[in-house]
Design a protein with these regions (language model features):
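Promoter-recognition and DNA-melting modules of sigma-like transcription initiation factors
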Residues: 66-106
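Extreme N-terminal regulatory/targeting segments of RNA polymerase sigma factors
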Residues: 1-59, 63, 97
Length: 106
């Protein structure tokens, strides 16, 4: 558990530093990453919404994409976490849109 004083220390950390801590199973750290990335997720969801899926459903898929990014990010890859997360989030949303389209066609 992270104390309130530690929480303010967390806000000073970079996304990459938070990802390293989140990988150790710290929920508070993941919550901070979610709050930092939520505007990006909402913006992508609004941009990608389709008749088959509303922005809220797409945002939910985006948060799943963020979780995947936290679990799979490697600093050695050369991209910032934010860039990597944006790709994971967008890919997850696009997969959900494709799935919704194929479900409607069936």
């Amino acid at each position: 558990m992270i104390s309130p004083g530690d929480r303010s220390d967390l806000t000073a950390l970079s996304d990459e530093q938070l990802v390293r801590l989140a990988g150790k199973g710290t929920e508070e750290v993941f919550g901070l990453l979610v709050s930092r990335c939520a505007p990006m997720i909402q913006q992508q969801a609004l941009r990608l919404r389709r008749v088959s899926m509303d922005a809220e459903d797409l945002a939910q898929e985006g948060f799943v994409g963020l979780l995947s990014a936290v679990r799979t990010y490697r600093e050695e890859g050369g991209a910032s976490f934010r860039t990597y997360a944006a790709v994971c989030i967008r890919n997850r949303m696009l997969s959900a849109i494709r799935q919704a389209g194929s479900d409607e066609a069936a």
